[in-house]
Structure formats: C-alpha cells, structure tokens
Amino acid sequence: MSHIRSRFSKPADELVVRYTTSLPFDWRLYQEDIKCSTAHARMLGKQSIISAGDSQSIINGLSDILTEIETGSFVFKPEMEDIHMAIEGRLFELIGEAAGRLHTARSRNDQVATDVHLFVKNTCTSTINKIRTLQGALLKQAEAHQQTALPGYTHLQVAQPVLLSHHLLAYFEMLERDCGRFTDAKKRSDVMPLGSGALAGVPYPLDRKMVAEELGFTAISQNSLDAVSERDFVLEYLSDAAICQMHLSRLSEEMVIWSSAEYAFVELDDAYTTGSSIMPQKKNPDVAELCRGKTGRVYGSLNTMLTVMKGLPLSYNRDLQEDKEPLFECADTLGDSLEVFAGMIKTATFKPERMLRALEKGYVLATDIADYLVGKGESFRSSHGIVARLVSYAISQNKTFGELSLEEYRQFSNLFGNDIYAVDIKSALNARNLTGGTAPKQIAQAIARAKKILAEAGVKN
C-alpha cells in the first residue's frame, strides 16, 4: 500500500486507482519534475535541512532516473499514481531510505504547480520559435511577389486590388501579435510556486531564491494559497493558443479556396496534399483542412480548463489534475500546426496569371473610379451612386470598365474624360501610398520592417 494511504485501513478500489491515476499522461513532466527535485534537494542540503550526503545521494539518483527514462529502461509501474510518485518510488529503489528526505518541506501541490509552470514557460518559448519560422516563410513569399496583384475581398466578394505581398504580410502581422501574447504568457508562467507547501507555506528555513535561480525563474510566488491553486498561466497560454490557431484556421480556409480549380491562385506542394481513394485526379489540401478542423481541439482545451477552474474554492483541489491533458493536447496541436504550415507556405506556388484574370473580371476599380470623380469635384456619396449605376450598366453589356467607350462613361457623368482610362490596376495600387496601404512603396517598407523584426528575434531569413 502506498505511504499516502497509511491513514486508511484498506487499499483503494482497483477502479478508483484507474480513475484517479494521471501517470499515463503526466509522465511528460518527468524532465521538469527531476529538475525541480534536484534543485530542491540541493537547497535542502545547503540549508542543512538534510545532510549533505543525503542531498548528494538524491541528486545522483535523480540523474540516474533521468538517464533511465530517456534511454527507455525506466519501468513505469501502474500502481504509481503519477510521475512524481513514479520517480520517488524508483529513487527509493536506487538509494534507499535517503529518498524519503526529498519530500521534506515540499508538498505535491507546490511540486506539481512548479512543474507545470516550467512546462508552460518552455512551451511559450518553443511556440514563439515556431511562429517565427512560419513568419519567415510568409516573408519569403511576400518578397517574391511584390509585383503580384490579386483581388482583395470583403464578404468573399471581389472588392479592391491588393498586392499578394500585402495579403501575406497581413498574416505576418497576426502572428506578430501572437508572439507578443505568448511573450506575456511566458512572463506570467515565470513565477516559482515551490516552497508554498500544501497551502500555507512550510516551517523550514528554505532558500527559495536559490531554487528559483537554479530553475531559471525570475520571481517567486507571494501567496502560498494562490500559488498552489492558480492556473491563470495555463489559461493564458490556452487562450493565446486558441487565438493563434484561429489565425492558422483563417489562412487554412484561404489555402483551401485558393487551391480549388475555380480559383487556382495557388498550387500546394505534393508533400502537403493527398489524393482520393476513388478519384484519381484529386489533389486535396488535407493539411490545411485538418489544421482548420483541429482548431476545435484547441478551443476545447481552453473551454475545458475554464470549466475546471470556475468553481474551485481555495486552495488545492484534485480537479486541478485535469489541467494537464488539455494543456498537452493544445501544445501538441498548435506546435504541429505551426510546423506543418511553415513547410506548406514555403513550398507553395502562387499563380500571378490566375490572380490577374480574376482582377480583370471583378470591377475591382469601382472605388478608384469613384475617387476619380471626387478628384473632379463630385462628392463621394454622389460619386458612389454614379459608379454603382455604371457597374450595373457594364454588367448588362457584358463589358469591363476598360471596354466602355467614353460616350458610355459620359452617360453617367459629364465629369468623365479620356483620363479615366489611366485608372487601372497599377494606378489603384500606387494610390494607396500610406502606412499600412498596399502601394508597392509601402510594401517595400513593410517587408523591411518584417525583416528587422525577425532579425531582432534572431531568425535568419
């Protein structure tokens, strides 16, 4: 019987053991747990809370356990309810009774909280790195397509001409905000709960700062009740992940649409597409579709954790065991999505000629023609109505703006002159020459800014 059940007269029911164990999933915290235990043991020895000999024996034993786990020789025993007890149990086997001194001045409550803080902190770092890689892929494509124009859309209807670079850099900006959010989340996870005990602190002269420094934390928790029971930092990571995955889902939707035969704006590389079991001609954008579908998993992780936390009184409750599966699944899903998307964007082939064809038949210059009339002295509202009627006429005649005669233009306003034919895609793009606009000069500046952002982040592009 586990020493934790020494107060009870009989062992836990077998079903209860299976129901309450977390080892099948929290084994992933073994690195964080061993790192925390090593720092704790070292501090206990330094503070003479345990002997220097026991401290060193514990540290050596933990090092051996880490090697066993990473080489696959460690035996995960099902009777051990979590990774923390599995490691401690093996430590007893390796060094004997000295292992019992490791848990001095520590509870699993602050132990687990510290492990999860470390995991989230490290995951924020890896997530940011993966976002940077995807940003680099988007930037490369944007650089290559500074002269490629396509329709910009509202309501998925052709609206105004934009440069493909401008479109791709929109996602760069979304991802840049994601990096900022994960950087903030990392700050909130960079707080060490260890030393809080079960809930009220511990009656030992701990050197919490020493442990924090060894573990790489820049701050220690200030309230033991809060420290063992808060999971705000997990919620913040999950919330940030949901927003980031949503951005990927939006890009997924566009890759699905743009790669269809009706659009054919992009061809996805064979390595990132699949075929059909019955239709030989198919080249399906499954990676983009799955990324879009997996967004629900990430949202689900956030909703799960919010629900876990919503009714918990201070301080620790076993409900908090339910923080790990949604956290792990979310981290895996987002991490994989970012990695696969970086490869898919890097290898995608965009089709400028198809985009140009779409521009030619969408009346994308309607706003520019209205602006032309404004330049001639007409109010914009009046110009809007004139051009709306002009568009209806052009559609009825099955003509583009460029195919209308000057006489036809002048049926709608005498302000139209021969210079109306100077209003074209190039002039429309050049006219948006202000910060944030799609003009080529602005795109060049935006690309330079994006390069600077990545360079300052240490990303080679």
UniProtKB/Swiss-Prot annotation:
GO molecular function terms attached to this record: argininosuccinate lyase activity
Q: Which CDD domains match?
A: Argininosuccinate_lyase
A single Gene Ontology biological process assigned to it is: arginine biosynthetic process via ornithine
The record's annotation in Gene3D superfamilies points to: Fumarase/aspartase (C-terminal domain), Fumarase/aspartase (Central domain), Fumarase/aspartase (N-terminal domain)
* Keyword line: Amino-acid biosynthesis, Arginine biosynthesis, Cytoplasm, Lyase
Q: Does the keyword Transport apply?
A: no
Catalysed reaction(s)? 2-(N(omega)-L-arginino)succinate = fumarate + L-arginine
Q: Does the keyword ATP-binding apply?
A: no
Task: Tell me which GO cellular component terms the UniProt record holds.
Answer: cytosol
Subcellular locations according to the entry: Cytoplasm
Q: What is its main location?
A: cytoplasm
Q: What is its EC number?
A: 4.3.2.1
**Which pathway is recorded for this entry?**
Amino-acid biosynthesis; L-arginine biosynthesis; L-arginine from L-ornithine and carbamoyl phosphate: step 3/3
Classification via Pfam families: ASL_C2, Lyase_1
Indicate the family of this protein.
Answer: Belongs to the lyase 1 family. Argininosuccinate lyase subfamily.
**HAMAP family in the record:** Arg_succ_lyase
Mind telling me which NCBIfam families this protein's record contains? argH
Protein name per Swiss-Prot or TrEMBL: Argininosuccinate lyase
Q: Which organism is it from?
A: Dehalococcoides mccartyi (strain ATCC BAA-2266 / KCTC 15142 / 195)
- This protein's gene is called argH
